């Protein structure tokens, strides 16, 4: 054994590591490069991933050699009773007796830190208090890291340092859907190809650029000869229909499951959408991205590749990270983003891709 930066004993070759990252979908994508490096650095270790059951499909599509430990905290919170209590106790007992040497809390929430603590691992790694979503999480860590970098993917890689891992900042992990999802999307597209994919939705109301703007953007792109497809998430079909109406009815509507969404991204020429899971899926698939940012920070959460385009308004009040409504009542960070700005972003990203495809001029 050697010593961690804080002087505690470090397990140089851990046999079992518990990764804690519940979600959301985009957050899980951000965590993949760090877990990839754990696997590369400790090829003989067993690495388990504690994740919300609804998000485990993302890890499955990554192809990473981890054991998924699904958890359903939503059901536990909303279905209290003897059955749930028994299930929780059995889960905690299993966690404590699995013999983990180390846990890494990539989430930074009180519940994620607490579950890491319940694992009884002697080394529990997390961020310093100022970088946590819930500062009380700090009490459950034995090792804390103060990130030096801005992007969340980099910050998560920095959590590997107490284990003696020097982060490889260029590590990427691509998502690959199952063959059944690819076949389903091929059937839905029915020959439709070389298209721009728009995903207008998002769990946060404050991240959604309005349907009229997306519709006008689709119209501009189609006038340039670029086919446009629109997809959406649960409860967002009406937004997609409004885009179709504002665009003049000629966009391709493609409903998709989570796995089908990744397959759909594989077939797209360009992705356009907000700071949501689908945007991060598109980036992880490797297609060009134009991301529209409102109340969140593109420096921290934006697409990781430098060639991808972020459209945003630099304002003193952002980022505020408000989910449901603008605290100032205007949401100018999103409302003031014009169709022309996003259209120009699309042209810029497509031009870069075309230049990259042809190679440097002689």
Q: What are these model-predicted stretches?
A:
Residues 1-362:
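Catalytic machinery of carbohydrate-active enzymes
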């Amino acid at each position: 054994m050697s010593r961690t930066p804080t002087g505690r004993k470090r397990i140089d070759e851990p046999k079992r590591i518990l990764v804690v990252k519940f979600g959301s979908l985009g957050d899980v994508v951000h965590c993949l490069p760090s877990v990839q490096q754990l696997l590369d650095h400790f090829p003989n270790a067993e690495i388990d991933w504690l994740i919300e059951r609804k998000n485990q499909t993302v890890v499955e599509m990554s192809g990473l050699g981890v054991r998924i430990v699904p958890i359903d905290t939503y059901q536990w919170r909303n279905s209290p009773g003897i059955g749930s209590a028994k299930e929780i106790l059995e889960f905690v007992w299993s966690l404590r007796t699995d013999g983990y040497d180390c846990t890494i809390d990539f989430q930074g929430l009180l519940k994620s830190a607490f579950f890491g603590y319940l694992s009884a691992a002697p080394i529990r790694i997390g961020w310093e208090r100022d970088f946590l979503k819930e500062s009380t999480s700090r009490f459950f860590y034995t090792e804390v890291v103060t990130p030096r970098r801005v992007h969340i993917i980099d910050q998560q890689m920095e959590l590997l340092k107490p284990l003696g891992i020097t982060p490889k900042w260029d590590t990427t992990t691509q998502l690959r859907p199952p063959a059944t999802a690819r076949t389903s999307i091929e059937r839905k597209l029915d020959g439709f190809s070389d298209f721009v994919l728009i995903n207008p939705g998002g769990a946060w109301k404050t991240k959604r650029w309005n349907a009229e703007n997306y519709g006008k953007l689709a119209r501009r792109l189609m006038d340039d000869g670029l086919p446009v497809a629109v997809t959406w998430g649960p409860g967002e079909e009406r937004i997609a229909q409004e885009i179709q109406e504002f665009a003049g009815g000629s966009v391709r509507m493609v409903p998709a499951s989570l796995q089908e969404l990744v397959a759909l991204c594989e077939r797209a020429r360009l992705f356009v959408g907000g700071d949501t899971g689908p945007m991060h899926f598109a980036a992880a698939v490797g297609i060009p991205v134009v991301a529209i940012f409102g109340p969140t920070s593109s420096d921290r959460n934006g697409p990781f590749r430098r060639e991808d385009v972020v459209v945003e308004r630099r304002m003193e009040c952002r980022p505020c990270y408000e989910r449901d409504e603008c605290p100032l009542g205007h949401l100018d960070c999103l409302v003031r983003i014009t169709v022309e700005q996003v259209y120009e972003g699309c042209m810029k990203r497509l031009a870069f891709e075309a230049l990259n495809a042809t190679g440097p001029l002689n």
